[in-house]
A protein has these predicted regions:
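Core beta-strand-centered patch of the WYL/Sm-like small regulatory domain
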Residues: 1-84
Length: 84
């Protein structure tokens, strides 16, 4: 889970890198917690500078069928979940 802009969000992290605007970012699939839109689950792009804390939960997740390891929203990918 992450605390983003002061609110807890439960996410499955997939990619970390630099987005198209030049910001360090996390691409994740949000499955719970706060959502201003209320539309969950959903893919989200989180700016690392706005993540206040991270907690590793005792859970796992299956690779989402829409996961793209070559995410077009990222200019450079530093770390990614690998598919089998």
């Amino acid at each position: 889970s992450i605390v983003y802009d002061g609110k807890v969000r439960i996410v499955d992290p997939y990619l970390v890198g630099i987005n198209k605007k030049g910001n360090e970012a996390l691409r994740a699939y949000q499955v719970g917690g706060y959502s201003s839109s209320g539309n969950l689950p959903a893919w989200r792009l989180y700016l690392l500078k706005n993540i206040n804390s991270v907690e590793i939960l005792d859970t796992s997740f299956k690779i989402h069928p829409q996961y793209n390891p070559n995410d077009k929203g990222m200019a450079r990918i530093s770390c990614r979940v690998e598919t089998a």
